[in-house]
């Protein structure tokens, strides 16, 4: 194939099309209906490489142009191309690992020579690469609400801190209600708690941080055993920090966007959040609220079961779920998760509110996904399970499948997912590398791209594999801000023609090797829906949860 491209001076996108089509043409079943597939009496769709060799041997420019045009035209049918890639990967090479390592090394050479590594190292850096994967699937907002006892603040049983957050533990038997965190009449009492925690615990036992306490969380005593585990505390408190950012932006220009993104509340003031969190819900013939129910009921040893399920709250706000089902989920959170729970309620599609995607693509911010597989233990989703125009993304602890309508949308969705959970350290044969390739393979092979989009995919691939390697000074690039990350990935310079061809060859071969491997390394698809235990009659009554 290289001989054909060199002899006839085929470059750029035309060369990429010829290379890709040459890899899969043997898997095409051509009907020869229009007879335009024949070159010198041979079906070029089914025997593309052979026709290219004959054209090169004969020096036939006419046949060469016809073959290039045929390849470009064939690649417009991306679903057929994807099917042929799957069929072509049925044979698993015994040297697949060595071939993958070779292609990764070639890609690293382009990463260096194109100046992409130097460009990455020019971004902000930090000393440690540790991070927590964050999304808007769960929240600690309910623990900012203040426990009360007969009209006064409830007595505090224990004190702790995490970074700049004070933590107060309460005996549930001394709590008969909760009120908003911004209640003016209790501001002085909360400031007194901050001063008390600073005096008792000048240094954080978790992080070693000192200084002022910026906010106070109010937790039941039963959570002390959960917070005693460093990983649990880190996961919960990073989400608390996200919630505190939401609280402190009340009244700012960003606040309406945060309300819509996190709670599906549109065109509202800051006070409406209390209607959602404290609005009356009927459950087991009693009036309760999301905040009250979360505080008074236990989770399990999994830290997620102590949070509030933001996704279900958004689904209810969008009118696709009874609000009381949120409480049912929290009651059953020992055993089920979002995707399985929604499937059990006969909701074959989940609705997700995504704010960044419409900003970048101009599309809708309400997305529909279908459940795929739990993401426990670094399970790798199988690209063979994707259907037309679908890509993988991960919500909390399980993979879902989303349909995209344009190449840019697919790149954006994949970039958001990779930024959120993938950190490449240069080690190619790791679970995180295979997760990266499951996402990138679909972009590289399925979607029709131009040079700008391929350049973005190249930078995204380099980030996914090499993005967390330390610099020469032992520091790490800070990729945490999504807006900055998307700007750096999507808006970088276009690759030159030679760089484009070189990196496309390596990425295409890596993608095909991953598809081969996916025949062996498969994800475990969700089982049949669980039967949900009957929890009594749930009566729908007027309440303020849907208040705007």
From Swiss-Prot:
Pfam family, one: Orbi_NS1
Family named by the database record: Belongs to the orbivirus non-structural protein NS1 family.
Name of the molecule in the record: Non-structural protein NS1
Organism from which the protein derives: African horse sickness virus (AHSV)
Name of the encoding gene: Segment-5
